Regions:
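Acidic/aromatic-lined carbohydrate-recognition and catalytic surfaces
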Residues: 2-210, 214-215, 226, 237-312
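Glycan-recognition surfaces
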Residues: 156-170, 259-384, 408-414, 479-484
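An active-site-proximal structural segment forming one wall of the substrate-binding cleft
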Residues: 210-232, 325-330
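Alpha-helical packing segments of well-folded alpha/beta enzyme cores
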Residues: 119-122, 126, 213-224, 257, ...
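Short alpha-helical segments and helix-capping/turn motifs at coil-helix boundaries
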Residues: 43, 72-80, 118-121, 133-134, ...
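A structural motif
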Residues: 88, 229, 450-451
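Hydrophobic residues within beta-strands of alpha/beta enzymes
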Residues: 91, 232-234, 454
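Loop/helix patches that line or flank the sugar-binding groove of alpha-linked glycan CAZymes
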Residues: 330-543
Length: 543
């Protein structure tokens, strides 16, 4: 069996060539030696399981719940301890670093906490009650970061940190997750340069073809481990390696980058788990497991949200069940990160070749009829196609025909729609029914093999925040509402509220999962075929 040091050399030789690999490897080893000396406690591998049926991960922004005069991270900690301390093991704080756009995903400084949220002491306080998951937003950095500002000023240390491309070069094969140009012109000390920007003009891609970039990213990951991260989410990692003439996603060197990160952590922080966020077709997504021991310990199960939504809209679980039957694990060291909702929209690309195009079109139309939005991406031929559905998952389950009937009836009676929400007899205002329907989807996610990821607005029964979209002009804001602590607590304590019904029901599901070893993330799973309207599975404990 190869030593981890040998594996590290092999990865770096694959990425940068045999000639450069010895020098680059030596630089990595110096970094790891220094880290090991400072953090001996992290080097000790805990023999017990890293995750079990008792684990679930709450996904939240650091300021999702606020209280006047208090640092949001402090408010979040006390709120979560009070309401979820007995059912949630881990908190995934979405990017809490200083940023310039995209709600945190355009990082200015990876090693600081956004002062508007609190400080590292608040993160440490949260870690006393929960395990922590951090974001590594390392495909790109903010145009306001010190590195990119240095690049613009001609600082030689940063000239190769970003990918500069001649705008006349044909980039039509490059996969685009957005409808924006892949290159953005910037004025530098040396004139205009066109720089690679996968997601927006403010999010400038890092150049991993430069080993200095990978070394810096490795140092950032180790910094996160030293500050309490037991799980690290690699945001948009599928885009990190660029090769002109290819799609620039899921390339062999992309996987080697992830494998290098895994090896680095295995060498000095072996209890930290990597979770890859790769919003791509299912077969490409699960490739980030590697051989089951050398890449991500968990991958986002991106096809699950839309397939579950499709099953409920069509009252037919056949496609969902057939797909779920293929969810094999490559080893006893890797499993799925199951989720139905998060801060982003519901991805459509993961179900490519699983759902018929007609069904996808129906889901798009249904989302729009329910007050949601659709975000588009550019295609190779210049056309655009739906990339994600932007809608709260609870609202996405509604019946648009019933909603329309209700609105039409209100118009006839000259009743304001918001006032009518108080009418429990309206088909789409039956709170108990809405909660049960929503919890049925969550039960599927919680029962499947893997570790559940639960979005804040799911467990607390939120709905579309259309006012937020109007405020920001961004579709994703519909599912990113920040709530005042006093308001949400009042609703949670009101037995007639939707939040109360969803929250109390969700906690019952989590307690049932936690108490049964059959729901272990690595336990056996068999999908049962009973009838099209019933999703059934058999879970078996490891022993």
């Amino acid at each position: 069996m190869k030593s981890l040091e040998t594996k590290l050399f092999d990865h770096l030789a694959f990425l940068y060539g045999e000639e450069k690999a010895p020098t680059i490897t030596e630089r990595f080893l110096r970094l790891l030696k220094e880290f090991r000396a400072k953090h001996e406690e992290l080097v000790i591998s805990i023999p017990s399981e890293k995750v079990s049926e008792r684990d679930s991960i709450l996904i939240t922004y650091g300021d999702m719940v606020t209280k006047e005069g208090e640092a949001p991270l402090k408010t979040l900690a006390s709120f979560l301890e009070k309401y979820l301390g007995d059912v949630i093991s881990t908190v995934h704080i979405l990017p809490f670093y200083p940023y310039s756009s995209d709600d945190g995903f355009s990082v200015i400084d990876y090693r600081r906490v956004n002062s508007e949220l609190g400080g590292w002491e608040d993160v440490a306080a949260l870690s006393k009650s929960f395990r922590l998951m951090f974001d590594a937003v390392v495909n790109h950095t903010s145009s306001q970061s010190a590195a990119f500002q240095g690049f613009l000023k001609g600082d030689p240390d940063f000239q190769d940190f970003f990918t500069v491309v001649d705008p006349d070069i044909d980039l039509t094969r490059v996969f685009r997750p957005r409808a924006t140009p892949v290159l953005t012109p910037f004025e530098t000390a040396e004139g205009t340069k066109h720089v690679w920007t996968t997601f927006s003009a403010d999010q400038v891609d890092l150049n991993f073809a430069n080993p200095d970039v990978l070394l810096e990213v490795a140092d950032i990951l180790l910094f996160y481990a030293a500050n309490g991260a037991e799980f690290i989410r690699l945001d948009a990692v599928t885009f990190v390696w660029k090769e002109i003439g290819t799609t620039c996603i899921n390339l062999p060197r992309t996987h080697r980058i992830v494998q290098t990160m895994r090896t680095v952590l295995d060498m000095v922080a072996p209890n930290v788990m990597i979770i890859t966020e790769t919003n791509v077709p299912h077969e490409d997504n699960i490739a980030y497991f590697g051989d089951g021991t050398n890449e991500a310990q968990m991958v986002y199960n991106f096809a699950l949200p839309l397939l579950t939504l499709h099953a409920f809209h069509n009252a037919d679980v056949s496609i969902l069940s057939d797909w779920a039957a293929t969810l094999d694990l490559p080893s006893d060291q890797a499993t799925f990160f199951n989720f139905l909702a998060a801060h982003d929209g519901i991805g459509m690309l993961p179900v490519k070749n699983i759902l018929p195009l007609e069904d996808l079109s129906d889901l798009v139309a249904r989302t729009q009829s329910l007050g949601g939005y659709v975000s588009y991406k550019s295609n190779e031929d210049g056309s655009k196609s739906p990339y994600e559905l932007n809608i709260n998952y609870l609202d996405a389950l509604s019946d648009p025909d019933e909603v329309k009937k209700g609105i039409d009836h209100l118009d006839e009676l000259n009743i304001n729609y918001l006032d009518a929400l108080r009418n429990p007899d309206a088909p789409e205002n039956n709170i108990e029914l809405i909660a049960k329907r929503f919890l049925a989807t969550q039960a599927i996610m919680l029962a499947l093999r893997g570790v559940p990821g639960i979005y804040f607005h799911s467990i607390f029964g939120s709905k579309n925040w259309t006012e937020g979209v109007e405020q920001t002009g961004r579709h994703r804001t519909i599912n990113r509402q920040k709530v005042e602590c006093v308001q949400i607590e009042a609703e949670l304590n009101d037995p007639t509220s939707l939040r109360h019904h969803v929250f109390t029901g969700y906690k019952k599901l989590l307690k049932a999962r936690m108490s049964n070893p059959a729901f272990h993330p690595y336990g056996a799973q068999e999908i049962l075929s009973i009838q099209p309207s019933v999703f059934a599975l058999l879970r078996t404990s490891l022993d």
